[in-house]
Amino acid sequence: MKIGIIGAMEPEVAHLIAAMTNASSQTIAGIEFIAGTLAGKDVVVTRSGIGKVAASIATTLLIEKYAPDAVINTGSAGGFVDSLSIGDIVISSEVRHHDVDVTAFGYEIGQMAQQPAAFIPAPYLVEAANKAIKQLGEVKAIEGLICTGDSFICDPVRTKTMLEHFPTMAACEMEGAAIAQVCHQFGMPFVVIRSLSDNANNDSPVDFDSYIVKAGYHSALMVMLLLEQLDPNSVK
């Protein structure tokens, strides 16, 4: 079993890379891919860069060059659930674009033309993540809708509009739906796991800078615990 792991920023992948053994590195199109062993599984970890285009490029290269059995997107997010605090975790129940609008042609808000409205993670990856939750100690984790767009959300007006469009949204970030869309195109199982670095409000820029390392660590810890739970025979 080989798992591809994608984070956008250095703090989101640093703990994973530090924990790897037998690591080797290759750079393709300016993106570094580090192959090795993590939590008893063969993995390839990459830092994609921020945003949907960067994430799409990295995901495509990862799948084409390394042929993983599944892809995990890890990192930080802005939170929309009152019961969660900074550092807590959202496991994707579904992933959607929040900044896509082709409703003039009969699509749902957030649905890209000729694509599903929501991208659904592989049940066996979500199941493994839920088993891993029990080992997180005081860190809370829930399943929920994660939305993606090419903007850092810190405007209450925009937050209000997003919640009107996606009332069940638990978190927002800048790469997950792009990664999910590429995985959908390739028939690749995926899951998105995000730790909250801020609450998508006026304080978000300050909170993000203060808590990105904490969020990156918690998300990385969740990924490692998930890997431990994965049964190689469960890939499907």
Swiss-Prot record:
EC category: hydrolase
Pathway: Amino-acid biosynthesis; L-methionine biosynthesis via salvage pathway; S-methyl-5-thio-alpha-D-ribose 1-phosphate from S-methyl-5'-thioadenosine (hydrolase route): step 1/2
Residues annotated as catalytic: 12 (proton acceptor), 198 (proton donor)
EC identifiers of the protein: 3.2.2.9
Superkingdom of this protein's organism: Bacteria
Keyword tags: Amino-acid biosynthesis, Hydrolase, Methionine biosynthesis
GO biological process, one term: nucleoside catabolic process
Catalytic activity: S-adenosyl-L-homocysteine + H2O = S-(5-deoxy-D-ribos-5-yl)-L-homocysteine + adenine; S-methyl-5'-thioadenosine + H2O = 5-(methylsulfanyl)-D-ribose + adenine; 5'-deoxyadenosine + H2O = 5-deoxy-D-ribose + adenine
GO function term, MF aspect, one: adenosylhomocysteine nucleosidase activity
Record function comment: Catalyzes the irreversible cleavage of the glycosidic bond in both 5'-methylthioadenosine (MTA) and S-adenosylhomocysteine (SAH/AdoHcy) to adenine and the corresponding thioribose, 5'-methylthioribose and S-ribosylhomocysteine, respectively. Also cleaves 5'-deoxyadenosine, a toxic by-product of radical S-adenosylmethionine (SAM) enzymes, into 5-deoxyribose and adenine.
Family of this protein: Belongs to the PNP/UDP phosphorylase family. MtnN subfamily.
Name the record gives this protein: 5'-methylthioadenosine/S-adenosylhomocysteine nucleosidase
Organism of this sequence: Shewanella sp. (strain MR-7)
Organism classification: Bacteria, Pseudomonadati, Pseudomonadota, Gammaproteobacteria, Alteromonadales
Gene this protein is translated from: mtnN
